[in-house]
């Protein structure tokens, strides 16, 4: 698998996508096939809005199944990190030395990013700047407004 195609996901997200794919294949797909069959029985397909709507829905379902298959075939599961060094899966507590504000977050893959849950992408400027560092290190964050941050803890260590 090429590095650029890898998609880092938590085990929970992998499970969620697998369940969605199963539902689309085993529930949604058969239902839309039935809708198409029923719409065909109404006669002239050239002016059949139900048929057109069902075919469009079928296309959306098939597109989503293909998308999920692509995601899952390229998925790399992010394990909880227990390392002293920051990496994917690490829970990090930092101190912004300019503002004096502390912040705690988990570094995750792009598909798992959720600022409301304090989950940031490993591709974000903050994560890119601190990956590989350890507790006690002071790091310059390469963001639009550069600032320095002190790493207070990594995985509660």
Curated annotation (Swiss-Prot):
It comes from the Bacteria. Keywords: Coiled coil, DNA-binding, Transcription, Transcription regulation. The keyword Transcription regulation applies. One of its GO terms (biological process) is regulation of DNA-templated transcription elongation. PROSITE patterns: GREAB_2. InterPro entries: GreA/GreB_C_sf, TF_GreA/GreB_CS, Tscrpt_elong_fac_GreA, Tscrpt_elong_fac_GreA/B, Tscrpt_elong_fac_GreA/B_C, Tscrpt_elong_fac_GreA/B_fam, Tscrpt_elong_fac_GreA/B_N, Tscrpt_elong_fac_GreA/B_N_sf. The keyword Transport does not apply. One of its GO terms (molecular function) is DNA binding. Residues 47-75 form a coiled coil. Belongs to the GreA/GreB family. Necessary for efficient RNA polymerase transcription elongation past template-encoded arresting sites. The arresting sites in DNA have the property of trapping a certain fraction of elongating RNA polymerases that pass through, resulting in locked ternary complexes. Cleavage of the nascent transcript by cleavage factors such as GreA or GreB allows the resumption of elongation from the new 3'terminus. GreA releases sequences of 2 to 3 nucleotides. This is Transcription elongation factor GreA. It comes from Mycoplasmopsis pulmonis (strain UAB CTIP) (Mycoplasma pulmonis).
